[in-house]
Amino acid sequence: MKKIKIKDKNMTKFIIVRHGQSKSNEGGYLAGVTDVPLSSLGEKQANAVCQYIINKYKIDAIYSSPLERACNTVKGVADALDLPIIKEDNLIELDFGELEGLTLEQIKNNFDNDYGKWANDPGVYVPKGGEAMSHLQARVVEKLKEIAKKEGEKTVLVGSHSSVIRALQCYIQGLPLEKMKNTPWVVNASLAEINFDGENFYIFKYGYDGHLVNLF
């Protein structure tokens, strides 16, 4: 992973959080762009990650996917610091098209060929009526650069989703999306610390979940 010492360059620091467990995660079905709330465990995870962030970082601004599960995961920080949550459509999860709302078992039984393609190559396969991962990656990178230009040398909290974080990791590491299936999974309410110096992104933390240890 690309790394650089913060003191070497002026940077925007992004703390990017995957939402806490949602009702769809709990129920084992794909939500994608469908708006679903956090589960009771997800609410506890959100509280834990917010407390960690408040204690660890000086957050200057908060952005989020417009979906409830992402916004409510970072709401604790917004409330504690009296900061608005700026909702950005380009930080939203991947649109799974006709697979939205289906369990993995339903996908396997009804879209067997699609299930195999998706399971084996999530970075490349595009579900019917859905979004390509390459499009998601491009919109996320563009939006983060736009935020960095606006916020400057600040620490920015971002509430988002697993596909967003994994696609961003591929971009930063220069990996083709064909390799996305080999990137580490990011659990609910874990976070990534990623800096941007105006030209390049650098990963300092990825999938950090130490704040969740007492919840299990």
Tell me what each language-model feature is.
Residues 79-139, 195, 202-205, 216:
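Phosphate-handling substructures
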Residues 2-12, 94-109, 149-154, 170-216:
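Acidic, low-complexity terminal tails and accessory targeting/binding regions
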Residues 76, 167-171:
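Active-site signature of alpha/beta-hydrolase-fold catalytic machinery across serine-
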Residues 21-87:
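Active-site-proximal alpha-helix that buttresses catalytic centers in soluble enzyme cores
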Residues 161:
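Short basic (Lys/Arg) and small-residue
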Residues 55-61, 149-156:
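Surface-exposed helix-capping loop/turn segments at secondary-structure junctions
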Residues 22, 164-165:
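Short active-site segment of divalent metal-dependent hydrolases/proteases
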Residues 13-19, 158:
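Short, hydrophobic/glycine-enriched beta-strand segments
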